[in-house]
Regions:
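C-terminal alpha-helical cap/extension of soluble enzyme domains
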Residues: 155-218
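Glycine-enriched alpha-helix->loop->beta-strand junction motifs that scaffold or abut catalytic
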Residues: 20-24, 80-84, 100-109, 124-131, ...
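Catalytic cores of alpha/beta
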Residues: 11-19, 69-73, 97, 115-125, ...
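Active-site beta->alpha loop and helix N-cap motifs at the rims of alpha/beta catalytic domains
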Residues: 3-5, 9-13, 19-21, 27-100, ...
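Glycine-rich phosphate-binding active-site loops on the catalytic face of alpha/beta enzymes
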Residues: 29-33, 112, 128-140, 181-202
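Conserved, mostly hydrophobic/aromatic
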Residues: 28, 86, 122, 178, ...
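Alpha-helix-loop-beta-strand connector modules within alpha/beta enzyme cores
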Residues: 44-58, 95-108, 144-164, 207-218
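Glycine- and other small-residue-rich loops at beta-strand/loop junctions that grip anionic moieties
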Residues: 5, 60-63, 87-90, 111, ...
C-alpha cells in the first residue's frame, strides 16, 4: 500500500518525505487556503515546489464545476509537471472531464466519492485514482471502510486499473483498516503517518535497553 500525505504545507511534506516512506501528495483548495496560497500563479508555483520535493504523484484540484473550465484548468495543471495528477470532483461534468483527460493521457484523481456507484462511474470514465472519504462517511454514521472494501471488490471483479486512494483519514485505525481491505493508497495527515510509529511498549523497551546499557558502560 502506498502512503500519500494530505497537505499543502511544504515543511510537513519534507518531514514525511525524510521518513523514506512517502509515495505522493494530495492537496485541495481548503489546504491551499490554509497555507495562504492566493492566486492561480502562486498556486501553480506551489504545486511545482511540492513536485520538486517528492518523487511521486501530486494531486492538484480544479476549482471549476463547468466542463469547459474544468478542461482548461486541468490541462494547465497537467502541464506544470509530469507528477501532477488532476483532481476532479465526482459530479456529472467531472466524469465527463475525466473521460476527456483519460483520452488525452492526462492522469486524474476523482475526489469526493461517497458511494460505490460514483466509484464505478469514475473507473469506467478512466480515472487513475478514486478517492472515497472514509472519515466524512463515519461522521454521518455510515461505514467508510466498508465502502472502501466494496470499491476494491468491484474493481477486482471488472479488472479496472483505477487505484483506490482513500482520503479523509482521521486516525491510524483507519489506515490499518484500509490496508486490510486492500486499498491501494491512503492519504493522511503527517500526524497519522507518525502515529503508526507510536506504541508504549516500544518506548518502555527502548528505555530499558538504554538503562541496561548505561549500567554496564557507564
Amino acid at each position: 500500500m502506498k502512503f500519500f500525505i494530505d497537505t499543502a504545507n511544504l515543511e510537513q511534506i519534507r518531514e514525511a518525505n525524510a521518513l523514506g516512506v512517502l509515495d505522493g501528495v494530495t492537496t485541495n483548495p481548503s489546504l491551499m487556503a490554509k497555507e495562504g496560497i492566493k492566486g492561480v500563479e502562486n498556486q501553480h508555483k506551489h504545486y511545482i515546489e511540492i513536485c520538486n520535493i517528492v518523487d511521486g504523484d501530486v494531486s492538484a484540484e480544479v476549482i471549476a464545476t463547468d466542463y469547459e473550465e474544468m478542461i482548461r484548468e486541468g490541462e494547465e495543471l497537467a502541464a506544470l509537471n509530469p507528477h501532477i495528477v488532476v483532481k476532479v470532483p465526482c459530479i456529472e461534468n467531472g466524469i465527463k472531464a475525466i473521460k476527456y483527460f483519460s483520452n488525452k493521457g492526462i492522469r486524474t484523481n476523482c475526489t469526493l466519492v461517497f458511494s460505490a456507484g460514483q466509484a464505478l462511474l469514475a473507473a469506467k470514465a478512466g480515472a487513475t485514482y478514486v478517492s472515497p472519504f472514509v472519515g466524512r462517511l463515519d461522521d454521518i454514521c455510515s461505514d467508510g471502510v466498508g465502502l472502501v472494501a466494496q470499491i476494491v471488490d468491484l474493481y477486482q471483479t471488472y479488472d479496472y486499473t483505477t487505484q483506490v486512494l482513500v482520503a479523509s483519514i482521521r486516525n491510524t485505525l483507519h489506515i490499518l483498516q484500509c490496508a486490510e481491505v486492500g486499498a491501494d493508497v491512503v492519504t493522511c495527515p503527517l500526524s497519522a503517518i507518525k502515529g503508526l510509529l507510536t506504541h508504549p511498549l516500544t518506548d518502555i523497551g527502548l528505555e530499558k535497553f538504554l538503562a541496561d546499557y548505561r549500567k554496564v558502560n557507564g
